């Protein structure tokens, strides 16, 4: 199902739609307007550590905090799990990638985001993958960043289909 809402502002009619595709493991967000508008697409919060914005593509990386002291089963014996001292080895890593398509106007990437100027429509497609392997392996085995990027590439390939096919 697609969630949509329409409203008007300054004599312009806006429609915003959001759809999450389970087969493609991604999100599609669309904004359409009866009049040109400008918007800055950027990502904040959510434990993001690095952001990279290009003209129509963005990549995010981060680590969700983990908890030491949880009981896990290792070699069929319960034991307490403690994260290593190195911050980059603590928690669940994630990588997100997305693309931005504009109708009309122009797009400019900067360190702050992707600025879309004088557009009548915007579509953002985004997928995120994590190092989480499941509760039974959550703290003893995680996907490597290379494995995450491989799964993410497959998701983005599926997500590149026309909207109606998702």
Functional labels for PLM-detected ranges:
Residues 1-166:
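Aromatic-residue-lined binding/catalytic grooves and analogous aromatic/hydrophobic interfacial grooves
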